[in-house]
Amino acid sequence: MDFEHIPVLFNDTVNSLEIKPDGLYVDCTAGGGGHSHAVAQRLSDKGRLIAIDRDPEAIEVLKARFASFPNVEIVHNTFDNISAILNGRKADGIMADLGVSSHQIDTAERGFSFHMDAPLDMRMSKEGKSAADVVNTYSENELYRIIRDYGEERYAKSIAKNIVK
């Protein structure tokens, strides 16, 4: 599977970690592994990288990409569980490229892009309700609250009303 993603601020991000060869680093949103790969290449045998992602497709790509890196730990989880993932270990550096990845936007089946004719999904993984489920089953008030609170949209009431029409 091709998991093309253009990392944001690639060099700035990796350089700001000031990587120590024997350090412990965490990529909270590993995706296709671009940032992770740059970190892993700078580690010695004593160094460790933990690459976390919630997307099962990304996890498969990461497992293949880092198969020859024994000091890279691939974790299928969300970054909000970082304390449990670290399990008492102290990280020397943590990075997170938050948001939707290029791969997710460019893959029609993921349902993130309005440029392609595909079902409305918009999930980071296949767990939970799709965006289509939400807009087709939630009440106008529920949609209004979501759009207002998470989208910070001043026309949330009008948008919710038009969705349920």
List the model feature ranges, each with a label:
Residues 1-165:
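S-adenosyl-L-methionine-dependent methyltransferase catalytic core, i.e., the SAM/SAH-binding region
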